[in-house]
Amino acid sequence: MKKMMHIRMGLTILMALTLLVLAACSNSSKAAVADTKTRVGIVLTEVGLGDRSFNDAAFNGLVKARDEKSIVFDYREPSKDLTAEAAFEEFSKEKFDLIIGLSNTVLTDMEKAAAKYPDQQFLLIDSQSALPNIASISFRAEEGSYLAGIIAGMASKENHVGFLGGMEIPALKDFEQGFKQGVLAVNPEAAVEAVYAGDFGNADLGKQLAQKMIQEQNVDVIYVAAGLTGVGALAEIQAQGKYAIGVDTDQFFLAEKAILTSMLKNIDVSIYNAVNSFIENKHTFPKKEIVEGLAENAVGLTGLHNITLSEEQQKTFDDLKTKISSGQTKITLNP
């Protein structure tokens, strides 16, 4: 009897050990799979997720790459408690394969980390750096903004349109200049007012600026490129019964009675493609600087709302778009 009990006890212990070994093997297998995935970190702008524009679009590009390709990713939202520099430092210490930063506003902080970790690969969106370990994606956003200007010039009844930008940085100055030249291409008598909020994350400020442009400057179409600040502006433009043009993503749902179109800067597509290229090229980029525009379908407009172009206007729009896309017409950008 005692012998049978010893046998049963031995079998129980053996089974328990077997299960532990199998579990350990399973965990090791999962860890091995995780180790083979490319690790990507992204540092957003201070506005963070929920801007329904720049940050959200970039984030969605990585979500798609995560869901369809062999990557895992994490993100940081700079704040009072976490600077962009500290966020880049964190990802670098954790040895992420690729660290992405958004816009010219994080350039200085990224360069500090890149200089400290020369073997770490970085990718900067909407700006460029001379450092060898910082690749970049820039957009000829002035081309898409030129198209937005054409629509604004055709839609304006007052011959007075506006541009409302977030911060006066080089990328947005390109937006402004492309927009102005598009307006004047179809409406040479129009005046174009440009206002910068100095903030991408203040919806109330956007509302105030839009109201001022409409009531004091008699602007009836405003191109808004201001992140969360722009969300407030769009709501106010609609409340005032005027027209707006959105940016980065299709913002029609934010002001359905006001939005004529949105200038798409396909950041999600460009980041998705860049990550795949990084993986395919064994964690390097074939080109240090990637610049994309209309010809690459990196920028463009959504469908039109609240406006119908005449046959003549549509022909004018198509002809001007072809000339910009082919390089026949050049947009002048002042430094």
Model-based region annotation:
Residues 2-13:
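Bacterial N-terminal signal peptides that target proteins for export
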Residues 25-335:
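A residue-level marker of the well-folded mature domains of exported/periplasmic proteins
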